[in-house]
């Protein structure tokens, strides 16, 4: 079958106890990026009595995690998703919410529901909220980023998902800190480099209408004013030829704009670009070539923040500013998975994100009052405060 790490076993035990209890509120578990969440989900689902429905956030992640489930030796499982032309129901059913929402009656007999990436659940409405409300099922959510953006006339705020109004998830039943996993050797150490271009000024960036991030227009204007593109290309070239002569195990660049990514792919040798418009077969070809070293640099726009599993990757270039803690964490998390083929991951930030959020390994879940969870960085609150 498979062998769980101690914290994975604790997470699985807590989940099974939750489903077997008479708890009247739904719950979450917080497991950092790289902690093996898919393995924990597989173990939970396999141990539970009755039928278990596992929601995955996208067809790509569903396909990846279902394959892992089968590889662990779990056989009584199936996929219910139009994207796979498969609507089979088994003891363990992996699904996307879009395929299930119009066929809720087929799942009323399910005892247990697990939602992967549960921070995507909108308590104020949407398909998840409708499914949970109408089926009255018992739900466990798992996520590495347990917060959602809330906006009002007072501004924007990241709210811990057990503190939203209305509320779907009522309590945290298990969490493990990033720093704990680093100390146990289950995550890779990271070195950070803040390398902004000369003259870069965040004060020139403007918030969008929700306050959740910066406007495209203000970012474009600031990038043009300081010739950000030339700086980005120079940084990537320096990373390709480091002073110590040690070749990096892949350089993954995150940009905001498609045209910018296309230019980088054209101007840097052994570089390719992927975006939401890249065909699946072409994306797989590029990423496989990236993993073998045939392609040394991949520039991406709006993808590869989740579901891209390449533990050997050791260099991230953050070439976009963001006000999204989730996005920052997800991007940095691409380099935090351990591998015997890398000593440390490098995070090269060109746009002030490091100053805004701090190092990912310094993020911590704290509970100053019972069930009043928040995320802090070196003691500075990042959730449940206006920004």
Regions found by a protein language model. Give the residues of each.
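Conserved Walker A/P-loop ATP-binding site and its immediately adjacent core
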Residues: 33, 38-71, 256-258
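Conserved pre-motif I regulatory segment
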Residues: 1-30
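Inter-Walker segment of RecA-like/P-loop motor cores
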Residues: 71-105
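Post-DEXD/H (motif II) to motif III coupling segment of the RecA-like Helicase ATP-binding lobe
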Residues: 120-191
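Walker A/P-loop
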Residues: 22-44, 254, 274, 299
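Conserved RecA-like P-loop NTPase helicase motor core
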Residues: 98-104, 121, 275-369
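Conserved interdomain linker/interface between the two RecA-like ATPase lobes of SF2 helicase motors
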Residues: 167-252
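Conserved helicase ATPase core of P-loop NTP-dependent helicases/translocases
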Residues: 63, 78-89, 252, 260-263, ...
């Amino acid at each position: 079958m498979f062998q769980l790490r101690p914290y994975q076993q604790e997470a699985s035990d807590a989940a099974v106890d939750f489903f077997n209890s008479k708890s009247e509120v739904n719950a979450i578990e917080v497991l950092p990026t790289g902690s093996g969440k898919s393995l924990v989900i597989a173990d939970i689902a396999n141990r539970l009595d009755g039928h278990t429905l596992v929601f995955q956030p996208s067809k790509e992640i569903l396909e990846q995690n279902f394959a892992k489930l089968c590889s662990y030796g779990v056989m009584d499982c199936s996929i219910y998703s139009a994207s796979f032309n498969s609507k089979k129901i088994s003891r363990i059913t992996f699904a996307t919410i879009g395929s299930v929402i119009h066929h809720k009656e087929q799942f009323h007999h399910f005892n247990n529901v697990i939602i992967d990436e549960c921070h995507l659940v909108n308590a104020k409405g949407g398909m998840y909220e409708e499914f949970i409300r109408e089926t009255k099922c018992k739900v466990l959510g798992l996520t590495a980023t347990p917060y959602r953006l809330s906006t009002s006339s007072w501004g924007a705020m990241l709210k811990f998902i057990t503190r939203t109004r209305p509320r779907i998830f009522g309590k945290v039943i298990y969490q493990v800190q990033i720093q704990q996993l680093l100390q146990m050797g289950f995550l890779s150490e990271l070195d950070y480099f803040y390398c902004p271009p000369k003259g870069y000024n965040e004060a020139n960036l403007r918030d969008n209408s929700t306050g959740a991030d910066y406007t495209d227009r203000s970012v474009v204007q600031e990038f043009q004013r300081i010739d950000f593109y030339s700086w980005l290309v120079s940084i990537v070239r320096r990373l390709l030829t480091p002073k110590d002569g040690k070749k990096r195990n892949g350089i993954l660049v995150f940009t905001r704009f498609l045209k910018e990514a296309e230019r980088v792919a054209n101007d840097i040798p052994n570089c390719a670009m992927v975006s939401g418009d890249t065909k699946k077969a072409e994306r797989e070809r590029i990423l496989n070539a990236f993993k073998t070293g045939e392609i040394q640099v991949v520039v991406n726009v709006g993808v590869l923040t989740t579901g891209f599993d390449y533990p050997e990757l050791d260099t991230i270039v953050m070439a976009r500013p963001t006000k999204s803690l989730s996005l920052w964490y997800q991007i940095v998390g691409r380099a935090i998975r351990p591998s015997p083929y890398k000593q440390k991951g490098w995070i090269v930030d060109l746009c002030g994100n490091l100053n805004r959020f701090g190092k990912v390994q310094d993020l911590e879940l704290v509970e100053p009052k019972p069930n009043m969870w928040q995320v802090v960085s070196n003691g500075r609150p990042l959730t449940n405060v206006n920004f």
